[in-house]
Amino acid sequence: MGMVLFACLLLLIIFPTCGYAAINTSSPLSIRQTLSSPGGFYELGFFSPNNTQNQYVGIWFKKIVPRVVVWVANRDTPVTSSAANLTISSNGSLILLDGKQDVIWSTGKAFTSNKCHAELLDTGNFVVIDDVSGNKLWQSFEHLGNTMLPQSSLMYDTSNGKKRVLTTWKSNSDPSPGEFSLEITPQIPTQGLIRRGSVPYWRCGPWAKTRFSGISGIDASYVSPFSVVQDTAAGTGSFSYSTLRNYNLSYVTLTPEGKMKILWDDGNNWKLHLSLPENPCDLYGRCGPYGLCVRSDPPKCECLKGFVPKSDEEWGKGNWTSGCVRRTKLSCQAKSSMKTQGKDTDIFYRMTDVKTPDLHQFASFLNAEQCYQGCLGNCSCTAFAYISGIGCLVWNGELADTVQFLSSGEFLFIRLASSELAGSSRRKIIVGTTVSLSIFLILVFAAIMLWRYRAKQNDAWKNGFERQDVSGVNFFEMHTIRTATNNFSPSNKLGQGGFGPVYKGKLVDGKEIGVKRLASSSGQGTEEFMNEITLISKLQHRNLVRLLGYCIDGEEKLLIYEFMVNKSLDIFIFDPCLKFELDWPKRFNIIQGIARGLLYLHRDSRLRVIHRDLKVSNILLDDRMNPKISDFGLARMFQGTQYQDNTRRVVGTLGYMSPEYAWAGLFSEKSDIYSFGVLMLEIISGKRISRFIYGDESKGLLAYTWDSWCETGGSNLLDRDLTDTCQAFEVARCVQIGLLCVQHEAVDRPNTLQVLSMLTSATDLPVPKQPIFAVHTLNDMPMLQANSQDFLSVNEMTESMIQGR
């Protein structure tokens, strides 16, 4: 009998600590209880920060230690009673009661329904739901603290003055509101702004479709998790973010020190993606009006071109807040000389890699020339910028908080009196005349030394390659290649690759070759060059291009390939006339051939190779239209048991890069599969991933494919000019395989062997999920290159360096 009583007592003790599914009038949440989200991602309950005696109701990540609190209900009013509880009142509002049953905190709004309950969703949103209608009566996502989760948002509404902001904790042990807040401004376009009290502390620059233009290291090729929606007519705007990584949990937080941080969980610990501000130059207005903060090491303040310190004494003491003043007054005769600038007309000085000043105004000019003319014709216009993803911005008045980045900034044109540049030119002539003779002598000496260095370097290169395992690959002399290509004649140029031009050549024995000439500015250095030679020399497959040899001559580096008569696949499928030469059977054969080449790289060769830059222009076609995978400069070899790797240098072509690779630098067989899926859909549809837009919402190719598959099974995705040559079920099957290859999560994508099996058999296919880039409009996607040539850019980030091509 005693054992039974003990068991009952034990159950009574344990029961209150169990997680609740919901809170209602009859089931309040006590201090010893918690409320879990259905999937177990988040938990709500009472907590004491840093082991203080104060109790708060908060939400945190359930399975992560140490605890990270993402929302607090009673920030200003902690409870100390162990009898406190959270419940639903008779009028439907959520209330927190202390031990005396006094209301400590509430949602502050009474509802007509008293039949409701509160639950915690898997998004981390704590909601009060009407049991009758199912409507949300209140939600924590509309009452943010210091943290944003995916699907929550900052907002403003100028019609009623409302805004939703993040507010810091006062300290790590005190969740009451601190002195810093993060908001989005009602400017067009908006920008993120951290305030210290009411004073601007940091800003991220105007929004440019996929990025905030004032964050260093992030340019138009950045794969952004952010999204901004503004309705100019309604005076509303919102900012949110989504998790593009291969992980479920992430958050944006504002620390008590005023730093905005973005973190995600990789399964072991939290990874920091961004932390802003990160440099003294990021602090608002550090160098005063018309000052320029240069992010050098150490950072320094300068005056903008044509300006001088307002107070030399204060400037010399390091007190730069008074800023600078114009050295020469503007002539402002622009209106009378719109077409021809006289000698007294104001001019614009171009600055590069700049965080543009605050207090911009959007001007609806259609191009940069109109933007320039509009500013020139307005005497109060002190500067203008024409930014990709935004358009024309102008500044009327002081230029405040201008920052000089080392790279990845914007162009800014500041208005100056013409005499400013004229004086500069005269000084340059004097200096140039004085030192020209010295420079000439130095150059002669340098040329001699460079010649000697190149001779030694050339020998070193050759010796280096001799030590490598490059059997079957010949070394060609430069004069042989120059003769074969008619001295790299423009008429022999086949195209432009990501690392330089490609030429057609003919050797003395009549054999035709393709010559890849690596540009010194291309970004492919010694590592990529060595990589491509050593890799391809070991790879032999009918669906891989064959390397015949290489050439090194000083700074010149060349690769010599077998010549492909039909050049690359993109020439055919995107050309309105040539596309008819590739009917559906040929396209299906090309898809299968690429898959076989990938299978060889991933599974069947003696090396396991991840290509990392699979795209339509890297598929060459022989005289029978058989595909051959080319361009192995970015490829990586894996060890026998290795299936995944990561890199700080993310390289590839935007649109083809998988989310986990573009965002986290993780690459594997599955990242090549993602690229293959995009490539498949381009071959089927005849539409470029980087150019195709459809619908009022400017959706891209993946969204178009998803809609096609949902509506017709995908059979209508095929280029309509080719429908007479195909079997609809075969096209629909390929579309479904393509969608499976571009799944957001790598684990949901098939491997290469499975893909080839799907293409060559009639087995049932899994049902694909909606691709992540089909959820958002094209405006929410990363900016993609708009021409057939590859574009190389370098974007340095906290965790990785992205190079889009």
From Swiss-Prot:
Disulphide bridges: 281-293, 287-301, 371-392, 375-381
Record's comment on post-translational modification: Autophosphorylated at Tyr-600. Autophosphorylation at Tyr-600 is required for downstream phosphorylation of the receptor-like cytoplasmic kinase PBL34, PBL35 and PBL36, and activation of plant immunity.
Domain Bulb-type lectin: 22-141
Phenotype upon loss of function: No visible phenotype under normal growth conditions, but mutant plants are hyper-susceptible to infection by the bacterial pathogen Pseudomonas syringae.
GO terms of biological process kind: detection of lipopolysaccharide; innate immune response; lipopolysaccharide-mediated signaling pathway; pattern recognition receptor signaling pathway; protein autophosphorylation; recognition of pollen
Signal peptide extent: 1-21
Region (CaM-binding): 577-594
Residues bound to ATP: 494-502, 516
Glycan-carrying positions: 24, 50, 85, 91, 248, 319, 378
Catalytic residues, chain numbering: 613
Main localization, broad class: membrane
Record domain Protein kinase: where: 488-773
Modified residues (Phosphothreonine): 647
SMART domains: B_lectin, PAN_AP, S_TKc
Sequence ranges assigned to domain EGF-like in this UniProt record: 277-313
Pfam families (alphabetical): B_lectin, DUF3403, PAN_2, PK_Tyr_Ser-Thr, S_locus_glycop
Cytoplasmic compartment spans: 450-805
UniProt subcellular location: Cell membrane
Residues that bear Phosphoserine: 522, 537, 617, 630, 690, 793
Catalytic reactions on record: L-seryl-[protein] + ATP = O-phospho-L-seryl-[protein] + ADP + H(+); L-threonyl-[protein] + ATP = O-phospho-L-threonyl-[protein] + ADP + H(+); L-tyrosyl-[protein] + ATP = O-phospho-L-tyrosyl-[protein] + ADP + H(+)
Membrane-topology annotation of the record: Single-pass type I membrane protein
Effect of residue 613 to V: Loss of autophosphorylation
Residues exposed to the Extracellular side: 22-428
Functional note: S-domain receptor protein kinase involved in lipopolysaccharide (LPS) sensing. Specifically detects LPS of Pseudomonas and Xanthomonas species. LPS are major components of the outer membrane of Gram-negative bacteria and are important microbe-associated molecular patterns (MAMPs) that trigger biphasic production of reactive oxygen species (ROS) and immune responses in plants. Seems to be only partially associated with the second LPS-triggered ROS burst. (Microbial infection) Targeted by the bacterial type III effector protein tyrosine phosphatase HopAO1 from Pseudomonas syringae. HopAO1 dephosphorylates Tyr-600, which suppresses the immune response.
Subunit text: Interacts with PUB9, PUB13, PUB14, PUB29, PUB38, PUB44 and PUB45. Interacts with PBL34, PBL35 and PBL36.
Protein name from the UniProt record: G-type lectin S-receptor-like serine/threonine-protein kinase SD1-29
